[in-house]
Amino acid sequence: MKKTKKIIAISAGFVVVVLLLVFLYLYYNGLSDLYAHTVPTEGQIKVACVGDSITYGHGITNWPKNNYPAVLGSILGNGYHVQNFGQRGTTLQKDTDRPYTKGKPYAQSLEYGADILVFMLGTNDSTTGRWIDAEAFIADYEEIINSYKESNPDIRIILCTPACAFFDGNQNSGKTDFGIRPSIIKEIATRIRSFALAKSYELVDVYDLTQNHPEWFEADNVHPSNDGARAIAQLVADKIKNK
């Protein structure tokens, strides 16, 4: 009887250790959908980074320190409080299976009361079955941007084009991993540039930054690696500091 109990205890302990290791692996590689939110101190400039898995940091090694919003916070320094509101797999367009505006991070980003919004959505909109057309995309784009302006009329808005996506080998399908279509991402980037210009919004051209750097991406050719995340963070930091 004692031997049986000992075996059960050892087995239970082994299961706990395995589950803990799995959790740590997912968390530290940006695969857990958990957040490391902190509370800003008085006087800090609040920066909300809104986006999808590229903002969240999908696949980033040592995710808590190396996702692009975390790196951005390190670059900007103690005078800024940067919060990651990226949600993996979400779209900008509202009439899809996973619109960003239906998720908890969207509501949290509004409640955060940011002084600066860094906005990067559009990659997941490029997939078959989600993409309608550029006009529908921009209509929804303007609607969500306006929701932040309504929440804080004085908010500084910085729009980002989505990162480039790369083909690996056969291009006949027109898609890369996750069903992402590089041709549509290119069109989305063009439309966001035009929208930013027409509406006098500041722009960070992440597409332009990344289009000649496939080495900045993970094996899936969609998500920036640690190097890519750092490059994005530096570009955003330069925009924030050099208004």
Predicted regions and their residues:
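N-terminal secretory targeting modules
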Residues: 1-50, 54-62, 73-78, 112, ...
